[in-house]
UniProtKB/Swiss-Prot annotation:
Acts as a protein-folding catalyst that interacts with nascent polypeptides to catalyze the formation, isomerization, and reduction or oxidation of disulfide bonds. May play a role in storage protein biogenesis. Disulfide bonds join C102-C105, C444-C447. The record marks G445, H446 as: Contributes to redox potential value. Residues 46-180, 394-523 form the Thioredoxin domain. It catalyses: Catalyzes the rearrangement of -S-S- bonds in proteins. It comes from Oryza sativa subsp. japonica. The lineage of its organism: Eukaryota, Viridiplantae, Streptophyta, Embryophyta, Tracheophyta. This is Protein disulfide isomerase-like 1-4. Belongs to the protein disulfide isomerase family.
C-alpha cells in the first residue's frame, strides 16, 4: 500500500506550487454553455426573473406569506443560550422545533400562537416555546429532530413527542390533559380488586400520604406515559393485594402485567418522575414484542434502543418463538426482543427490506437503534444458548456490523460513478483522489430534481483525473463513512484526508456552486477543462436553446426529504 505520509507530503508540495485558483477559472463556461442543453431539458436554464424560475415543490413555498401578522406574544423564543435555564424554571414546556422555510411550520404558526394565547392563564403551569432548528442545530441534534415541525412536550426536562393534530383546539386539549391529575387514589380493597380484574397493566404506588412531594412525582410520571394507568394508595391492605409489604419503607411502587409470566415488577430506583417513567417504559412491554403498525411507536420510542429481532415466516413461528422468548428472559431491561412476521406484507416485508434481509430463511438480527443504526446478524443455529451469547456479545460491542449493498456494477464508465456499499472504499475512499458523493433515494423529489444538474457537473469535470463525481442509492446501500442526513446528502472527501469526516455541501444545488465547493476543498488543485471553442460554436449553431442564459435552474435552496 502506498505510504500515507508520503502521499500527504506530495499533496502539500502540489498545494504550495499551484498557481491556479477558483477565481482564475472561466466560470461563464459553466453558466452560459447552452450548447449541451437539449431544448426539452426538464432542468433547463432560465433567465433571472423568469416567471417560471420558481420551485415547483409547494411543500416548501406554499403559504410563506401570511395574510395577517401573527401575534406570538405568548410564544417564547428559545435558543441554546436560554434553553436549559427555561426548562429548569418551567415544569411543563411545549417546544416546536421549526425551520423558517418550512411550509408546514408556517401553516402551524397561527394555531400554535393561538394555543399559547388560550393557555396563557395557566402560565404558572405551562409555557409554549419555539426553537429555530436551522440556527440552533446542536439543540435539534440533541433532541433527534429529523423533520419539521417537531413538537416536544417537556415535563421536568424530560421530552415527550406530540403527535396530535396541528390545530389550536388539539394542542390546547392535549396540554390540558397533561396538566390534569394523572394518578387516581385507591382507598379500599374493593377498588383494588376491580383494577386487578379489569386492567391488563397498571402502576400502583404505596405512599404515606396521598398528597405531597411523592404524590406529585407519581402524577408527573403519569403524564409522561399515555398507555398505562397510575394509582396510589396509603392502605396497607391494598399493598398486600399487590404483594407489597405494608411494613416496608415507603414510597414503594409496582408494575402489574397480567398477560406475562412475571405479573409483578417491583421498582427500586429513585422516586423521581423521570426515573419512574423510564422504569415503566422499559418494563411495560412483554418479553417478546410482535411488530405491527400499532406496536411500532412503543417499540421504537422505547428508552431501551438496542433490539434483537427475530424474522420468521408465520408457519414457522411456533418453532422459533419459544426459543426466542426463553433467551429474552436474561436481558430484561437491557434489550428489546422483537418478533417480525417475515411474510406479513404490511410490516414484515418493508422491515426486512430496510435491514437488507432477502429470502424467507429465519433470521436473528441485532439493531443498535436510530442513533447509529448498525445491524448485526446471528450466524449458526438458532438456539437459546446461541441467541444469549449473541446478545451478550452485542451488549459488549464484540460483533462486526453488517452493511447492505447492491451488487457492484459490471460497467462503471459514466461521468458520474455508481457507488454501492461494496465498492465505496475503492471509489470514494481512494486516498489519491478527491471525491464528491451524492447519497440519494429513488423516491425523493429533490433528488430527482438534482439529477440533471449533477450529471452536468460530472460531464464538465470528467476530464480531471484527480477528481471523482459519484452517487449512491442510500436506500439500498450502507457504509459507515457515508451516512445521509436526509436526501439528498452531498459529501466531499478530500484526497489524503479520507480518515477525517467528509465535508457536507450545504449551498445552492447548481453546477457553479457545487464546482466552487469542490474547488475550495479539493486537496489536489485542478484547472477546468473547457471544450474546443470551434466545436462549441458548431453545437451552438445547431441548438435551438436561448443564447442569453444567466443561471441554471435548480432547487436553489438546500432542501432535503426526510429519511
Amino acid at each position: 500500500m502506498r505510504s500515507r505520509s508520503l502521499l500527504l507530503v506530495a499533496l502539500a508540495t502540489l498545494l504550495l506550487h499551484a498557481s491556479a485558483s477558483a477565481s482564475d477559472d472561466d466560470l461563464d463556461y459553466l453558466i452560459d454553455n447552452a450548447d449541451d442543453i437539449p431544448a426539452n431539458d426538464p432542468d433547463g436554464w432560465l433567465q433571472e426573473g423568469s416567471p417560471d424560475d420558481d420551485d415547483d415543490d409547494d411543500l416548501f413555498h406554499h403559504g410563506q406569506a401570511q395574510d395577517h401578522p401573527i401575534d406570538e406574544t405568548h410564544v417564547f423564543l428559545l435558543s441554546a443560550a436560554n434553553f436549559s435555564d427555561f426548562l429548569a424554571s418551567h415544569r411543563h414546556v411545549m417546544v416546536e422545533f421549526y425551520a423558517p422555510w418550512c411550509a408546514h411550520c408556517q401553516a402551524l404558526a397561527p394555531d400554535y400562537a393561538a394555543a399559547a394565547a388560550d393557555l396563557s392563564p395557566l402560565a404558572h403551569q405551562v409555557a409554549l416555546a419555539k426553537v429555530d432548528a436551522t440556527e440552533d442545530t446542536d439543540l435539534a441534534q440533541k433532541y433527534d429532530v429529523q423533520g419539521f415541525p417537531t413538537i416536544l412536550f417537556f415535563i421536568d426536562g424530560v421530552p415527550k413527542d406530540y403527535n396530535g393534530a396541528r390545530t389550536k383546539e388539539a394542542i390546547v386539549s392535549w396540554v390540558n390533559k397533561k396538566l390534569a391529575p394523572g394518578v387516581q387514589n385507591i382507598t379500599t380493597v374493593d377498588e383494588a380488586e376491580k383494577i386487578l380484574t379489569g386492567e391488563d397493566k397498571a402502576i400502583l404506588a404505596v405512599l404515606d400520604s396521598l398528597s405531597g412531594a411523592h404524590s406529585d412525582e407519581i402524577a408527573a410520571a403519569s403524564r409522561l406515559e399515555d398507555a398505562i394507568n397510575f394509582y396510589q394508595t396509603s392502605n396497607p391492605d391494598v399493598a398486600k393485594l399487590f404483594h407489597l409489604d405494608p411494613a416496608a419503607k415507603r414510597p414503594s411502587l409496582v408494575l402489574l402485567k397480567k398477560q406475562e409470566e412475571e405479573k409483578l415488577t417491583f421498582y427500586d430506583g429513585p422516586f423521581k418522575a423521570s426515573a419512574i417513567a423510564d422504569f415503566v417504559s422499559a418494563n411495560k412491554l412483554p418479553l417478546v414484542n410482535t411488530l405491527t403498525q400499532e406496536t411500532a411507536p412503543s417499540i421504537f420510542d422505547n428508552p431501551i434502543k438496542k433490539q434483537i429481532l427475530l424474522f420468521v415466516v408465520a408457519n414457522e413461528s411456533s418453532k422459533f418463538l419459544p426459543i426466542f422468548k426463553e433467551a429474552s428472559k436474561s436481558f430484561k431491561g437491557k434489550l428489546l426482543f422483537v418478533f417480525v412476521e417475515r411474510d406479513n406484507e404490511e410490516v414484515g416485508e418493508p422491515v426486512a427490506n430496510y435491514f437488507g434481509i432477502t429470502g424467507q430463511e429465519t433470521t436473528v438480527l441485532a439493531y443498535t437503534g436510530n442513533e447509529d443504526a448498525r445491524n448485526f446478524f446471528l450466524d449458526g443455529e438458532i438456539s437459546v444458548e446461541n441467541i444469549k451469547r449473541f446478545a451478550e456479545d452485542f451488549l459488549e460491542e464484540k460483533l462486526t456490523p453488517f452493511y447492505k449493498s447492491e451488487p457492484v456494477p459490471e460497467s462503471n464508465e459514466g461521468d458520474v460513478k455508481i457507488v454501492v456499499g461494496k465498492n465505496l472504499d475503492q471509489i470514494v475512499l481512494d486516498e489519491s483522489k478527491d471525491a464528491l458523493l451524492e447519497i440519494y433515494a429513488p423516491w425523493c423529489g429533490h433528488c430527482q430534481e438534482l439529477e440533471p444538474t449533477y450529471n452536468k457537473l460530472g460531464k464538465h469535470l470528467r476530464g480531471i483525473d484527480s477528481l471523482v463525481i459519484a452517487k449512491m442509492d442510500g436506500t439500498a446501500n450502507e457504509h459507515p463513512r457515508a451516512k445521509p442526513d436526509g436526501f439528498p446528502t452531498i459529501l466531499f472527501y478530500p484526497a489524503g484526508k479520507k480518515s477525517f469526516e467528509p465535508i457536507t455541501f450545504e449551498g445552492d444545488r447548481t453546477v457553479v456552486e457545487m464546482y466552487k465547493f469542490i474547488k475550495k476543498h479539493a486537496s489536489i488543485p485542478f484547472k477546468l477543462k473547457r471544450p474546443d471553442s470551434s466545436a462549441t460554436k458548431t453545437e451552438k449553431d445547431q441548438s435551438t436553446a436561448s443564447t442569453n442564459l444567466r443561471g441554471e435552474r435548480s432547487s436553489g435552496t438546500n432542501f432535503k426529504d426526510e429519511l
